[in-house]
Amino acid sequence: VKKRPGTNAVMAALAASALFGASTPLAKQFVGDMSALLLAGLLYLGSGTGLLGLRLLRDRGWRRPGLARSEWPWLLGAIGCGGVLGPVLLMLGLASTSAASASLLLNLEGVLTALLAWLFFKENADRRVVLGMALVVAGGLLLSWPGPATGTNPGGTGAALIVGACLCWALDNNLTRQVANSDALYIAGLKGIVAAAVNIGLALAMGQALPASHVMAPVLLIGFLGYGISLALFVLALRGLGAARTGAYFGAAPFMGAAIAIGVFGESTSPLFWAAGLFMAAGLWLHLTERHAHPHWHGTLQHSHPHFPDMDHRHDHP
């Protein structure tokens, strides 16, 4: 019987994509106020402290996360790729790229996530999804095409840095999939705290100073919502969809970011930008209308944590 992937998992993936998509044009507004290292660190500081604070409230104190020893290498690898390298590369890329173009380039994260999931983690591939990925790549190539230094058509270094960030997050997504049945708030919160400590520590060691509180506060809030809550929802989606399909649904994020960059911040665009957007939108449509009917087998899941917020209704149990 053909059926759509679990509705709750899909909604979690789309909510995660909306929050993360909004964070890109918002974070770009602070690129000139601090270094890429410091900005990435503060974004993840907001994420980590906010999520671990929610976890403490949920559990009314500290509870052991219940991670098996064999799961720690996966989680630490995810933190290194997605929490340390990815955001720094993105902030460096944003310095020479418009938020609208950077947002659309982030569609490549879903492509790279799916490729890694299919090649190394043996997830199933669907022809519609493969065609959709090809359209997204075509759009990415258009956005990366060298052009005038207007910021609307990055080309060169800016695009390469953002593609590098996408690869880091694709690795992160597949590594996180290996521990996705553990406490989502703990996984996302720990990733934020470690990423913040590394990035802020490096920035301070290089002689950089923390920004004023009126600059730091909105950055922390953007990090909490766009990186923290978004990541917790993403982990929940991974449980029901796997890395490849969660990455495909997450493809809505770049369009949210581009819409904010153009509609709110008035960024200019180019014909190549709109052509790329059409390719990527067509690719996303193929992902969202995907149906699959291959057999699934899930091992028994043992949950040792209460669900927050109402997490038992946000993912399917076997």
Task: Name each model feature, range by range.
Residues 30, 39, 43, 93, ...:
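Hydrophobic/aromatic residues within transmembrane alpha-helices
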Residues 18-24, 52, 56-101, 106, ...:
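Specific transmembrane alpha-helical segments of multi-pass solute transporters/efflux pumps
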